[in-house]
Amino acid sequence: MFKILRKERLAPGINLFEIESPRIAKHAKPGQFVMIRLHEKGERIPLTIADVDISKGSITIVAQEVGKTTRELGTYEAGDYILDVLGPLGKPSHIDYFGTVVMIGGGVGVAEIYPVAKAMKEKGNYVISILGFRTKDLVFWEDKLRSVSDEVIVTTNDGSYGMKGFTTHALQKLIEEGRKIDLVHAVGPAIMMKAVAELTKPYGIKTVASLNPIMVDGTGMCGACRVTVGGEVKFACVDGPEFDAHLVDWDQLMNRLAYYRDLEKISLEKWERERRMV
């Protein structure tokens, strides 16, 4: 059992949980994730480790309420317990000195780029962070990213805050200004990461994407998270989650992400009905 030490509502439908787990906190590296299961009847879902506090023996995860499990997680409060937290899993991000690194986070992906941006900055890189949100009310962790970045650009789809448009518009502007970019690291919706990859490829800019396919066990046994990278089948949980964005078969990934959408909807509706009956 893993105790929730702190819960914070970052934005509508987006929750931060600080979870007591000294072992994971001690061994976690930027880019890695955990598999959580709320209770014995719950499913396992992957969540990226957004921060660690070794002195407190805690890890921080940020989850958006999009399905049954994340909605149920959203009802948990500080003092509650999560049955299973397995990790750290996945290969850590490749942290090195590259020069100018552009970190791109879309939605909850903003939380996921934080530890990587921090590590890249500590390596001496010039870090530009692009944070993308649908609207002003969903903006979070801007100050936190500013603390580990040399520049921060916030975009909103509707123009209610920061630059109007998508993260790719901000990246395109940097490229058009002639900024030398040595690495782009993107985390967010698959459609966003695909757009980033398509934008950087003609310029030969090395681009890494952290993939978020369906996962069941997180150890490479089930094969649910398989993705095609450079024509080869990879398991995101053990071979990734980060891959060369120019080699990912994005259309296949997005098709697989939509495969269980109807079942996920049924599961959520069932949970909501049962919750109303309590």
UniProtKB/Swiss-Prot annotation:
Gene3D superfamilies listed in its UniProt record: Nucleotide-binding domain of ferredoxin-NADP reductase (FNR) module, Translation factors
Domain FAD-binding FR-type: residue ranges: 1-95
Pfam families: DHODB_Fe-S_bind (PF10418)
InterPro entries: Cyt_c3_hydrogenase_gsu, Dihydroorotate_DH_Fe-S-bd, FAD-bd_FR_type, FNR_nucleotide-bd, PyrK_electron_transfer, Riboflavin_synthase-like_b-brl
Gene that encodes it: sudB
GO biological process, one term: pyrimidine nucleotide biosynthetic process
Free-text comment on the cofactor: Binds 1 FAD per subunit. Binds 1 [2Fe-2S] cluster.
Places the protein is found: Cytoplasm
Reactions mediated catalytically: n sulfur + hydrogen sulfide + NADP(+) = (n+1) sulfur + NADPH; 2 reduced [2Fe-2S]-[ferredoxin] + NADP(+) + H(+) = 2 oxidized [2Fe-2S]-[ferredoxin] + NADPH
Cited SUPFAM superfamilies: Ferredoxin reductase-like, C-terminal NADP-linked domain, Riboflavin synthase domain-like
Protein name, UniProt field: Sulfide dehydrogenase subunit beta
Organism domain of life: Archaea
Dependence of activity on temperature: Optimum temperature is 80 degrees Celsius. Has a half-life of 12 h at 95 degrees Celsius. Activity increases by 50% after incubation for several hours at 82 degrees Celsius.
Keywords: 2Fe-2S, Cytoplasm, FAD, Flavoprotein, Iron, Iron-sulfur, Metal-binding, NADP, Oxidoreductase
Gene Ontology MF terms: 2 iron, 2 sulfur cluster binding; ferredoxin-NADP+ reductase activity; flavin adenine dinucleotide binding; metal ion binding
GO cellular component: cytoplasm
CDD domains: DHOD_e_trans_like1
Binding site residues for [2Fe-2S] cluster: C222, C225, C237
